[in-house]
């Protein structure tokens, strides 16, 4: 036991404590401790509930942002499909246009080729005619010169002179 000279203290030996002391002290501890413990538990519960509400709000916000992002992704995928489709159509149109242009150019070149061949043939024929005429003239001149004598030459000159005088 604790003597009075030593002051106030707690007896930690359970066998030496008196049941009445415990009956007085324990209700005081439970009464005062209950309010403090209840207050601490209420504060802790409010913090936990606040954290849960905050987490729930953040989850809802994240869910909204996810839904928005999914919608934007779907829109972007649709645009990609549209762009690919337009690209294919444009490529097909350009290919068809290029093919028709190439066919047109080939037709034009074939026409130019035929025209060039025809012109070269005409040029060759004209050159051949010219050479033929020159050869014929040369043969005619040689033939005339070989057959012409002085009296025939004089008759020819007289005929030309009379032709000139009759025009005057």
From Swiss-Prot:
Transmembrane stretches, start-end: 20-37
Main location: plastid
Molecular function as annotated in GO: proton-transporting ATP synthase activity, rotational mechanism
Keywords: ATP synthesis, CF(0), Chloroplast, Hydrogen ion transport, Ion transport, Membrane, Plastid, Thylakoid, Transmembrane, Transmembrane helix, Transport
One Pfam assignment: ATP-synt_B
A single GO cellular-component term on record: chloroplast thylakoid membrane
UniProt-annotated location(s): Plastid, Chloroplast thylakoid membrane
Protein family according to the UniProt entry: Belongs to the ATPase B chain family.
Purpose of the protein: F(1)F(0) ATP synthase produces ATP from ADP in the presence of a proton or sodium gradient. F-type ATPases consist of two structural domains, F(1) containing the extramembraneous catalytic core and F(0) containing the membrane proton channel, linked together by a central stalk and a peripheral stalk. During catalysis, ATP synthesis in the catalytic domain of F(1) is coupled via a rotary mechanism of the central stalk subunits to proton translocation.
Additional observations: In plastids the F-type ATPase is also known as CF(1)CF(0).
Subunit structure: F-type ATPases have 2 components, F(1) - the catalytic core - and F(0) - the membrane proton channel. F(1) has five subunits: alpha(3), beta(3), gamma(1), delta(1), epsilon(1). F(0) has four main subunits: a(1), b(1), b'(1) and c(10-14). The alpha and beta chains form an alternating ring which encloses part of the gamma chain. F(1) is attached to F(0) by a central stalk formed by the gamma and epsilon chains, while a peripheral stalk is formed by the delta, b and b' chains.
Protein name in the entry: ATP synthase subunit b, chloroplastic
Organism: Ostreococcus tauri
Origin organism lineage: Eukaryota, Viridiplantae, Chlorophyta, Mamiellophyceae, Mamiellales
